[in-house]
C-alpha cells in the first residue's frame, strides 16, 4: 500500500520548483460540509496540499487560495472546534502545537462525547489531529493568502493573510516573498476526488519544450 500511495501521490521525475501555488477551497469536501469554512479544518486542508506538493514547492513558496470563509463552523459535525478556535486566540497560544496540553480535557468532555456517540459528530480529539496536521502549512510556506473571505478576521485568526482579489494577493506575494517572476502552479481541481498532483505536473511536463 505504501508503494501504491507513493506512485499515486508523487511524481519523482518532477524537477521544477514552484514559488506560488493557486487553488480553491470549496465549502464541502474531505471531512464534510464546512471543511472549507471552519478555520481549523481549513488549516488541515491547506496542510494536505503541503503534504501532496512539498517536493515541488520552492523554499519561498506561497499559497493563494480562494475561500468564502464565511464563519460557517458546522457545529453539529464538529461541536468542539468553535471552542478550540476561541481558545487558540488567547492564553499565550502562538502556534497550533501550543494547544496540545488541552487534548485530554477535550477528549474526555462529556457533552462532546455524547454528540460523538449519539448525534453523528466527530470525536473531540479529532480536532487535535486536525491541528497537528494544520501546523504543517505554517511550517512549509512563506505565506498563505485567503482570497474572497466574507469573514476575513476568522482567517487572520489562524495566521493567514487576506486579500479581496487574486490580483492583490499575487502582487503582495511578489513584492514580499517571490520576486517579480515567480513560477506559478494553478490547481483548478484541487478538491476534486480525482485530483492528483501528477496529472498537472504530467501535463506541464508534456507541454514544456525539451531542453537540450
Give residue spans per PLM region.
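Accessory "access/gating" subregions that flank catalytic or transport cores
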Residues: 1-41
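Generic recognition of flexible, low-complexity loop/linker segments
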Residues: 5-12, 50-54, 131-134, 171-174
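Glycine-rich phosphate/diphosphate-binding loops that line cofactor/substrate pockets in enzymes
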Residues: 14-17, 56-58, 173-181
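Structural motif
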Residues: 20-24, 64, 185-186
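Flexible loop/turn segments at secondary-structure boundaries
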Residues: 28-32, 71-76, 152-155, 192-195
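C-terminal catalytic subdomain
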Residues: 40-145
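Extended hydrophobic packing segments that form well-structured cores
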Residues: 131-203
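Conserved small/polar residues in nucleotide/adenosyl-binding loops
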Residues: 204-210
